[in-house]
């Protein structure tokens, strides 16, 4: 099987574009997609000699949910063991370190203290961060939100 047949079986490269992480994909004021993901997909389509169709999703969980539906051929997502059941991942192109934000008066001083009863952590549902926390934490509660902005809103309200 050739790279074109494998990556673009319909004759065009259908790229799942995740707007949930502005580091990779975002829209400008006129609604045009910009970012590293866009640049990479455009270059890949060019090298394959096929057209590019960008299939846009608001959140990474939506991209992952469509992985087995034949809607997209390639996407940039966090590598996560739950997703690996239905998605074939290449080696990571980058690594993003994440941390916790706590209120100024919090008694939590290290990441080791976070996994405790009574601790609530807001994270976007089905995002790589939330999937990791779900598998790693045993005692803290995860508040799954619609998106990153909702997580910040919950943090600010509590």
What are the language-model segments listed below?
Residues 53-65, 108-109, 143-157:
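Short helix-initiation/N-cap motifs at beta->coil->alpha
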Residues 93, 102-120:
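Flexible hinge/capping segments at coil-to-helix
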Residues 82-96:
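Ligand-binding "clamshell"
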Residues 14, 99-101:
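Residues embedded in well-ordered beta-strands
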Residues 25-29, 41-51, 91, 115, ...:
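Ligand-binding cleft/hinge of the Venus flytrap
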Residues 21-22, 60-61, 80-84, 106-108, ...:
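Solvent-exposed loop/turn segments at secondary-structure junctions
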Residues 1-78, 85:
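Extracytoplasmic small-molecule ligand-binding "clamshell" domains
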Residues 12-19, 34, 112-129, 140-142:
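Short loop->beta-strand "edge-of-pocket" segments that line small-molecule binding or catalytic clefts
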């Amino acid at each position: 099987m050739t790279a074109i047949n494998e990556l673009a079986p319909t004759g065009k490269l259908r790229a799942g574009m995740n707007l949930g992480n502005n580091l990779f994909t975002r829209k400008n004021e006129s609604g045009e997609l910009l970012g590293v993901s866009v640049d990479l997909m455009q270059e890949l389509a060019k090298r394959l000699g096929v057209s590019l169709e960008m299939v846009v999703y608001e959140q990474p969980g939506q991209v992952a949910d469509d992985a087995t539906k034949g809607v997209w051929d390639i996407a940039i997502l966090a590598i996560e063991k739950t997703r690996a059941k239905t998605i074939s991942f290449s080696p990571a192109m980058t690594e993003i370190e994440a941390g916790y934000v706590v209120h100024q008066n919090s008694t939590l001083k290290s990441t080791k203290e976070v996994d405790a009863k009574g601790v609530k952590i807001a994270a976007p549902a089905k995002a790589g961060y939330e999937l990791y926390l779900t598998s790693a934490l045993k005692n803290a509660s995860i508040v799954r939100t619609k998106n990153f902005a909702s997580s910040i809103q919950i943090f600010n309200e509590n």
